[in-house]
C-alpha cells in the first residue's frame, strides 16, 4: 500500500527562468523514483520538530520576499527587474521546500495510521483471547458447581445414628476396629446394615399382607351376610310406617334428616342439633329441616382423583389454552368475588309458629370462604293480610329481623378477617350483597356456635355447641315477640291510614270518654326527609335517628289547629318505645323550642310512656300514644285563654274538667289524666 501510494505522489518540478531547464529534462525517471522513495526513509531520520521550525522559517521568508517584490514593483526602475527575478528564484526554492515538507507530513500521517491500525488489530486479537479465556473460566466454574452440588443416592437415605448402629448391628457388619477410623468404610457398613434391616422389614411386610388378605376375606363374608339382612330390614321399616304416622313418631323421616345432617358444615350442624334439641325439649311448634343438594355437599369433601391421562394430555390442553383469549381483569375479579361469596349447597330451615298461626320461616346459609352464617326471613299468616301503604317495611325480609339485639343491623360482616379478603377482590362492604346472600346478624353466628373476638382476631373459629345452646332460647323468644309485634303494627296501621286510632277495651280507662281531636293522616316518611324537618333537630342531635329505624308522620286536627307528630319507630318496638316530636300550627307555629307546653306534651308520650303500655306484651303502645296526643291537643286548645278583643264565642270551649288551668310562670297546662275521677291535673 505504501509503495503504490508513493508512486502516485510524484513530485512536480517548478522551473524558473534563470535555472537551466535542459539539465532537468535530461534526468532519468529512475533517478526521480529513487529520490521519491528515499523520502520515506528520510522521514524516520528527520525530526518532526525541526521540520516544523523549518516550515515556520520558510513561511516567514516567503512573506518577506513577497513584501520586497511588492515594494520593488511599486518603486519601478531599470535594475528592479533583476532584483525581482532573484527574489522570485529564492521564492521558488522556498516553495520547493514547503512541498517537500508537505510530502513528509503526509508520509508521517500514513505511517501513523498504519501503526494505529496494526495496534488496533493486536488489541482486537488480545480482546478475543480474553473473551475465550473468560468463557473457559465460566465453563469451568459451572462444572465445579455441578461437582459441588452432586449428591449421591446414599445421602438421601436416613441412616440410623452411630450409637444405635454400633449397638444393634452384628460385629460382622459393624467391624468396629476398621470402621471407627475410616469414614468411608463406616458409611459402607451402615449401608449394609440398612440393607439388612430393609430385607427383614420386607419379609415382615409380606407376612402382614397375607394376614390382611385373610381378614379382608372374612370381612367380605360378613358383608354378604349383612347385605342379605338389608332387604328384610327395609320391609320391616315399610311395614312400620303406618304405626309411626299413627303414633306421631316419624323415625324414618328423622333418620333421613340425621343422615343428611352428616354433610352439613360445622356451624350449620351445630344449629341443626341445638335447634332440634330445643324444639323437642321446649317448643314443639319449632320445626327444623335441611334443604339443598346432598350430592353437591358430598362433592365438596371428595378428594380430587389423580389420573395419568390428565398428565399425558397436559401438553395438548396447554396448547389449547394459549390459543384462547385471556379473560379481562374485570371478569377475573367477578369470578373471584363469586367464589369468595359462595354458599354451602345445604341450608337449615327453621319454621317458628306463633299464637295467631303465623309462621316465621328462617333459612340459614353458610359462606364457606368467609366462615360466617347468614339468614333470610319470611313471614306467612293464616289469612292473607291487606298490606297498608305505611306497613310496607314492617314484614319485609330486609328489616323484619333488624336489630333483634341492640345494634345488630346485619349489614356488616362479623368476622374481622373478611375485610382483608374483600380488599383482594375489590369488595367495599358486604351490605351490597345481603339481599342475595342474607344478613350476617351476630345472633345468627352465635346460634351456629361462632364467636369472633374483635380484640384478638383468631385465624380459625371453631363452632361451639355451648355458645349456641346458651343463646337458643332467648333468641327464639325474641323472634316470636318480633313477629307478633310486627303483625300487631300491621293491623294497627290499616286503621290509622283510615283515620281511626284503635284502642282496645283493656286500655279505654286511660282516656276520657270524649275525645274531639282526630287523626286525619298517617304516612311513612323517608329517613332523609325526617332529618330535614326543622322540629326534629333534637332527636337527630341525640343520635336517635338511625337509618335502621322506621319513620312516620301523623297529622291530628281539631278545627283550625293542626298538630304534626314525627314518629321514630325503633325495630325493637314495643320493648323500645316510639319517640314523638311535635309541631302545632295554630296562631303561628309552635314547637318545643318556643312553647313549653309543646315540650310537656312530648314528655307525656315519650317520658310517661309506661302508663300507656297496657297489658303485656304492650303491642298497643303506639296507638295509645296517638290517642294520648289527641287528648293532649284537646286540653291544650280548651285551656287556652280567650282573647277579649275578639267578638263571638270561644273557638274551643272547655269540655275537660281541670283542677287548675295554669301553673307557674311558664303557665303550664294540666296534661295528666286521673282515672277514674276523670279530671286533668299537673304533674
UniProtKB/Swiss-Prot annotation:
Entry keyword annotation includes Iron-sulfur: no
Chain positions with N-acetylserine modification: 2
Subunit description: Component of the THO subcomplex, which is composed of THOC1, THOC2, THOC3, THOC5, THOC6 and THOC7. The THO subcomplex interacts with DDX39B to form the THO-DDX39B complex which multimerizes into a 28-subunit tetrameric assembly. Component of the transcription/export (TREX) complex at least composed of ALYREF/THOC4, DDX39B, SARNP/CIP29, CHTOP and the THO subcomplex; in the complex interacts with THOC1, THOC2, THOC5, THOC6 and THOC7; forms a coiled-coil dimer with THOC7; together with THOC6 and THOC7, plays a key structural role in oligomerization of the THO-DDX39B complex.
UniProt GO molecular function: mRNA binding
Region feature Tandem RWD domains, mapped onto this chain: 247-683
Residue list for modification Phosphoserine: 5-6, 307, 312, 314
Subcellular location, principal: nucleus
Compositional bias ranges of the Acidic residues kind: 306-319
Protein name: THO complex subunit 5
Stretches for region Interaction with CSF1R: 2-144
UniProt tissue specificity: Ubiquitously expressed.
Gene name, Swiss-Prot/TrEMBL: THOC5
Domain of life: Eukaryota
UniProt region (Interaction with THOC7), positions on chain: 2-199
Coiled coil: 81-247
Keyword flag Coiled coil: yes
Biological role: Component of the THO subcomplex of the TREX complex which is thought to couple mRNA transcription, processing and nuclear export, and which specifically associates with spliced mRNA and not with unspliced pre-mRNA. Plays a key structural role in the oligomerization of the THO-DDX39B complex. Regulates the expression of myeloid transcription factors CEBPA, CEBPB and GAB2 by enhancing the levels of phosphatidylinositol 3,4,5-trisphosphate. May be involved in the differentiation of granulocytes and adipocytes. Essential for hematopoietic primitive cell survival and plays an integral role in monocytic development.
Segments of this protein annotated with the region Disordered: 1-42, 301-336
Similarity remark: Belongs to the THOC5 family.
A Gene Ontology BP annotation from the UniProt entry: mRNA export from nucleus
Membrane-spanning parts: none
Comp. bias regions, Basic and acidic residues: 22-42
Keywords annotated in UniProt: Acetylation, Coiled coil, Cytoplasm, Differentiation, Isopeptide bond, mRNA processing, mRNA splicing, mRNA transport, Nucleus, Phosphoprotein, RNA-binding, Transport, Ubl conjugation
Chain location of the short sequence motif Nuclear localization signal per the record: 7-10
Modified residue annotations for Phosphothreonine: 328
Amino acid at each position: 500500500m505504501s509503495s503504490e501510494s508513493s508512486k502516485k505522489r510524484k513530485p512536480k518540478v517548478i522551473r524558473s527562468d534563470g535555472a537551466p531547464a535542459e539539465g532537468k529534462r535530461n534526468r532519468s525517471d529512475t533517478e526521480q523514483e529513487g529520490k521519491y522513495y528515499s523520502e520515506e526513509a528520510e522521514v524516520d531520520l528527520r525530526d518532526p520538530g525541526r521540520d516544523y521550525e523549518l516550515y515556520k522559517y520558510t513561511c516567514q521568508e516567503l512573506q518577506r520576499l513577497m513584501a520586497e517584490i511588492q515594494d520593488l514593483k511599486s518603486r519601478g526602475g531599470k535594475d528592479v527587474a533583476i532584483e525581482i527575478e532573484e527574489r522570485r528564484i529564492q521564492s521558488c526554492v522556498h516553495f520547493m521546500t514547503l512541498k517537500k515538507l508537505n510530502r513528509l507530513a503526509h508520509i508521517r500521517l500514513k505511517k501513523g495510521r498504519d501503526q494505529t491500525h496494526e495496534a488496533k488489530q493486536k488489541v482486537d486479537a488480545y480482546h478475543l483471547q480474553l473473551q475465550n479465556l473468560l468463557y473457559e473460566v465460566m465453563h469451568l466454574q459451572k462444572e465445579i458447581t455441578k461437582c459441588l452440588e452432586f449428591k449421591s443416592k446414599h445421602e438421601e437415605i436416613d441412616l440410623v445414628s452411630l450409637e444405635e448402629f454400633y449397638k444393634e448391628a452384628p460385629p460382622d457388619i459393624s467391624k468396629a476396629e476398621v470402621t471407627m477410623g475410616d469414614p468411608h468404610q463406616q458409611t459402607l457398613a451402615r449401608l449394609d446394615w440398612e440393607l439388612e434391616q430393609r430385607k427383614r422389614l420386607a419379609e415382615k411386610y409380606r407376612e402382614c399382607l397375607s394376614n390382611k388378605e385373610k381378614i379382608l376375606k372374612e370381612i367380605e363374608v360378613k358383608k354378604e351376610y349383612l347385605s342379605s339382612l338389608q332387604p328384610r330390614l327395609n320391609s320391616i321399616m315399610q311395614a312400620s310406617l303406618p304405626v309411626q304416622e299413627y303414633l306421631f313418631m316419624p323415625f324414618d323421616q328423622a333418620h333421613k334428616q340425621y343422615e343428611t345432617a352428616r354433610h352439613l358444615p360445622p356451624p350449620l350442624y351445630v344449629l341443626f342439633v341445638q335447634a332440634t334439641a330445643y324444639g323437642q325439649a321446649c317448643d314443639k311448634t319449632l320445626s327444623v329441616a335441611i334443604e339443598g343438594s346432598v350430592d353437591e355437599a358430598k362433592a365438596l369433601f371428595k378428594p380430587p382423583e389423580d389420573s395419568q391421562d390428565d398428565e399425558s394430555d397436559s401438553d395438548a390442553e396447554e396448547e389449547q389454552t394459549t390459543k384462547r383469549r385471556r379473560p379481562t381483569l374485570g371478569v377475573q375479579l367477578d369470578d373471584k368475588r363469586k367464589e369468595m361469596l359462595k354458599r354451602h349447597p345445604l341450608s337449615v330451615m327453621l319454621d317458628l309458629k306463633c299464637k295467631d298461626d303465623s309462621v316465621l320461616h328462617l333459612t340459614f346459609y353458610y359462606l364457606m370462604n368467609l366462615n360466617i352464617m347468614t339468614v333470610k326471613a319470611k313471614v306467612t299468616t293464616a289469612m292473607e293480610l291487606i298490606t297498608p301503604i305505611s306497613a310496607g317495611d314492617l314484614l319485609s325480609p330486609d328489616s323484619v329481623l333488624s336489630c333483634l339485639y341492640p345494634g345488630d343491623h346485619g349489614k356488616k360482616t362479623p368476622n374481622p378477617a373478611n375485610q382483608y379478603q374483600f380488599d383482594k377482590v375489590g369488595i367495599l362492604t358486604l351490605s351490597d350483597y345481603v339481599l342475595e346472600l342474607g344478613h350476617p346478624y351476630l345472633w345468627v353466628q352465635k346460634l351456629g356456635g361462632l364467636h369472633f373476638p374483635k380484640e384478638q382476631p383468631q385465624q380459625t373459629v371453631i363452632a361451639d355447641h355451648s355458645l349456641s345452646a346458651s343463646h337458643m332460647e332467648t333468641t327464639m323468644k325474641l323472634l316470636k315477640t318480633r313477629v307478633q309485634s310486627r303483625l300487631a303494627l300491621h293491623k294497627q296501621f290499616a286503621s290509622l291510614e283510615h283515620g281511626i286510632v284503635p284502642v282496645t277495651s283493656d286500655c279505654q280507662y286511660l282516656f276520657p270518654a270524649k275525645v274531639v281531636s282526630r287523626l286525619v293522616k298517617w304516612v311513612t316518611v323517608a329517613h332523609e326527609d325526617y332529618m330535614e324537618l326543622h322540629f326534629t333537630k333534637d332527636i337527630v342531635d341525640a343520635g336517635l335517628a338511625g337509618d335502621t329505624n322506621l319513620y312516620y308522620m301523623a297529622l291530628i286536627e281539631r278545627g283550625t289547629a293542626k298538630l304534626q307528630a314525627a314518629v321514630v319507630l325503633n325495630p325493637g318496638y314495643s320493648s323500645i318505645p316510639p319517640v314523638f316530636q311535635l309541631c302545632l300550627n295554630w296562631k303561628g307555629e309552635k314547637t318545643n323550642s318556643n312553647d313549653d307546653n309543646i315540650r310537656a306534651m312530648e314528655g307525656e308520650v315519650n317520658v310517661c310512656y309506661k302508663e300507656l303500655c297496657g297489658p303485656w306484651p304492650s303491642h298497643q303502645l303506639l296507638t295509645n300514644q296517638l290517642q294520648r296526643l289527641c287528648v293532649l291537643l284537646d286540653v291544650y286548645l280548651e285551656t287556652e285563654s280567650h282573647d277579649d278583643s275578639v267578638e263571638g264565642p270561644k273557638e274551643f270551649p272547655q269540655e275537660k274538667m281541670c283542677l287548675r288551668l295554669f301553673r307557674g310562670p311558664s303557665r303550664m297546662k294540666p296534661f295528666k289524666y286521673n282515672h277514674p275521677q276523670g279530671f286533668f291535673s299537673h304533674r
